[in-house]
Design a protein with these regions (language model features):
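Class I SAM-dependent transferase core
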Residues: 1-78, 86-90, 94, 107-121
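Conserved nucleotide-cofactor-binding alpha/beta core module
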Residues: 70-165
């Protein structure tokens, strides 16, 4: 019920119309990716702080990003700075495979546990430096950076397929 309300009040009014994106948000239990003390507020339209430098993006922003990227079922996606894995979980229902890179070992471990619990078996969580990405799994159709950067590192851009986004 709360997921439906989130979609109806935050995502659809933001001109997100692609069924795979909407269906993914309806299917993934956001509350599992929110810190214990904040689970009651999991579906409000805010970012959640999950570490010193990590947030779980608010549903509207993530949905608009995925709508703009036009993720396809046969695509390989690199999700850099996955945190607890919510974005990777949502993307996993739209793309073929998601490689989720996280540099915080406790967040990476918890993400693996949650993703396994919900059956997101097409997500691989990799512990490593964010600026390195995961070149061994690329090239990628789509690369998503969770957070702001002044300049995208060349090492990341080299992992993008020709024509990728």
């Amino acid at each position: 019920m709360r997921r439906q309300i989130m979609v109806d009040t935050q995502i659809r009014p933001s001109d997100v119309t692609k069924f795979p994106v909407i269906d993914a948000f309806l299917s993934i239990p956001r509350e599992k990716f929110v810190p214990d003390g904040k689970r009651e507020a999991a579906y409000i339209g805010e970012n959640f702080q999950i570490g010193q430098s990590r947030v779980i993006l608010d549903p509207r922003t993530l949905a608009k990003l995925l709508e703009a990227l036009d993720v396809q079922k046969d695509e390989l996606v690199l999700d850099i700075g996955t945190g607890l894995g919510y974005s990777s979980a949502v993307i996993s229902l739209i793309a073929e495979v998601v490689i989720a890179v996280e540099d915080d070992s406790s967040l990476a471990s918890e993400a693996e546990e949650i993703l396994s619990e919900i059956g997101a078996d097409n997500v691989v969580v990799q512990l490593g430096k964010l600026e390195d990405g995961a070149p061994e799994h690329g090239p990628y159709d789509i690369i998503i950076l969770q957070g702001g950067v002044e300049e995208i590192p060349g090492s990341i851009l080299k992992q993008l397929k020709n024509g990728g986004r």
